[in-house]
Amino acid sequence: MNFDAAGSRDVRYNCLTVFGFNSRRRNRLRSQPFPASWLPILIRNVSYYERLSPADKQELRQTIEVFVAEKNFEGCGGLEMTDEIKVTIAAFACILLLHIENHDYYPRLRSILVYPHAYVVPEARRAVGNFIVESDEARAGESWGNGVVVMSWDHVLHRPTDPGGSGNVVLHEFAHQLDQEKGVATGAPLLPKTSMYHMWARILGREYKALSEAAAANRPTLLDKYGATNPAEFFAVATECFFGQAGQLKERHPELYEELKLYYGQDPARTGSTT
């Protein structure tokens, strides 16, 4: 449980022809006018957008256009896919990318599956005596290493803001996607500089240990206790808190806030939180 960075520098994109084609196509997408019908969706569902500088607003809009064009959105459980669903999810996903240099628009991600409400997964198992008991588990979202993100539209729209709440499911699952870019989620995404991994492991490892101890003792915490599950979940939960409760995180966990600020290149305690 040490936020291992092993494999983080093994990610390579060496097909130059495909890379050149993608770059040209993305540049064309970014140069297109942002659809007029999408802007009210941003303003209505993504309050963080209004707090951004004009340059960051433009960058976010351009990134959203590429994201929506490249990723496959599928409605599940009877949900009809709409621009509102696509743009809202894309906006929160692209907020994470806003100042990450040389990002590749979540290169492993192919599809986003969206259910109308929490969806049931019949995979939870637990041992009871000599028996294995299977039970259904309701989920709001999950990120798979094979290029799929699943989430509940109801949870995307209705984001609890209290410290004990589940936060922002899009930020959470796409933090996992960033963590999974190197192939396995360890709680250490691809950081801008190799020299950053030592401090990242030290600070996030210490904060993860503190959250685990607080969760075991049932003490109140700012960070969602689900982050005590493992380092990968801690990074996702910390990301939610960084963007959603930035001022409180900076005040109560200043070193953790600083590490996330360095990674994301954003200062939401100054800009304003996403919620």
Predicted regions, residues:
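N-terminal alpha-helical targeting/anchoring segments
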Residues: T17-L39, E50
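Metalloprotease/metallohydrolase-associated module, dominated by Zn2+-dependent proteases
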Residues: L29, S37, S47-Y49, A55, ...
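Short, charged early-sequence alpha-helical segments and their helix-coil boundaries
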Residues: E74-K86
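Active-site recognition of the HExxH zinc-binding catalytic motif
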Residues: G165-E181, A236
